[in-house]
Regions:
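Hydrophobic transmembrane helix bundles of membrane-integrated enzymes that assemble
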Residues: 1-178, 241-331
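Long extracytoplasmic/lumenal interhelical loops at the membrane interface
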Residues: 56, 187-260
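Juxtamembrane membrane-water interface segments immediately following transmembrane helices
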Residues: 155-205, 218-220
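Short, intrinsically disordered terminal tails adjacent to the first/last structured region
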Residues: 329-339
Length: 339
């Protein structure tokens, strides 16, 4: 029971809605501006550590060099939201508006993450099309778009032709099914993730109750977990040398399927997509477009990141929910401080 409480503490963030809904528009704006400044500072540090190879932020143990840039994966936790906030709802004006947005955009690219880079560009282009009502408005965002498209071309040209296509070929030929025969290395990241999900999916199919609702919220490294699971696909625990059985930062779907099962995962996705649709329908309201794009980015990168799984990533959508419902209030339109 204690282990379940420890594992489920993240779900308490869902209760933050009842606190956040009491905030006024001015209080929300002030909080967001402060958090935006914090993320900008974190993004600067993250970019510096990429070029210097010196860890400046916590959680920087795992990294590898990629010629000019050292790849770190400890990017700011709130970056995914505030990169869109900086583009579409930036509280600054003049050159500071563009500099602050550019800092966050550069931070998105620094991990040299293929799926994140491509997903971000595609979603940003979608956001610009949803945002603009006229060609003149699109031209205002054109410099920002060009800054994003140029790295995309480089990433697609240099990496999609090699590693990505090899990964896709391995997955489409079904190599992940023969889990014990998989040889994972630098060139098989997508194959690793699919195999990781597949092994856990096959496990829950062994019992009807787990097929429907998953194996539960047991903690990693607990006695129960060590007895119940014996997965062979996963990262190695540096302390014990054993394979990490439940937790993974590589793919959200493994966490979802092993914890919630098929029905539980479908319920979670139904709620998540309903929130996305809500913000899409109200995208003219301030912060709604940024929130929709943020949720879409979490969904797009769910095969290479675990952030979709964590309830605390929904704090911003919960914060804006009530004020978005007041869409007829002219003070809440997307036009203020965004031109």
């Amino acid at each position: 029971f204690v282990e379940i409480i420890r594992t489920s503490r993240y779900y308490l963030f869902a209760l933050s809605y009842f606190v956040l809904r009491r905030l006024t528009k001015e209080e929300i704006s002030s909080i967001l501006k402060i958090l935006f400044c914090i993320v900008i500072f974190q993004s600067i540090l993250f970019t510096i550590q990429g070029f210097t190879g010196i860890a400046l932020l916590i959680g920087a143990e795992s990294h590898k060099s990629a010629k000019l840039i050292t790849r770190f994966y400890n990017s700011p936790l709130m970056l995914y939201f505030f990169v869109f906030y900086g583009i579409f709802n930036n509280p600054f004006t003049g050159k500071y508006k563009y500099i602050s947005a550019l800092i966050c955009i550069v931070c998105v690219y620094m991990p040299l993450h293929r799926s994140l880079t491509i997903s971000f560009i595609l979603i940003l282009i979608l956001g610009l099309f949803l945002k603009m009502g006229k060609i003149k408005q699109f031209i205002n965002y054109l410099p920002m778009l060009l800054l994003c498209v140029i790295p995309l071309v480089a990433v697609m040209g240099a990496q999609l032709a090699s590693r990505t296509m090899n990964d896709i070929n391995s997955v489409t030929t079904g190599e992940f099914v023969d889990i014990e025969e998989i040889e994972l290395g630098e060139e098989s990241t997508l194959l690793f993730r699919i195999a990781h999900f597949y092994e856990r999916y096959m496990h829950i199919l062994e019992k009807p109750i787990e097929t429907a609702f998953g194996s539960g919220l047991m903690a990693e490294e607990s006695n129960y977990t060590n007895k119940k699971f014996d997965f062979i696909v996963g990262l190695e625990n540096e302390k014990t040398g054993e394979i990490v059985q439940l937790e993974t930062s590589d793919i959200a779907w493994s966490n979802l399927i092993i914890r919630y099962g098929i029905i539980g995962t479908l319920i979670y996705l139904t709620i998540y997509i309903s929130i996305m649709i809500f913000y899409y329908k109200h995208r003219k309201v301030r912060y709604a477009l940024s929130t929709f794009l943020y949720l879409l980015l979490l969904l797009f990168t769910s095969i290479t990141s675990n952030q979709l799984y964590y309830v605390y990533m929904l704090v911003f959508p919960l914060m804006f929910f009530d004020m978005t419902l007041e869409k007829n209030n002219p003070n809440l339109t997307n036009n203020e401080n965004e031109e």
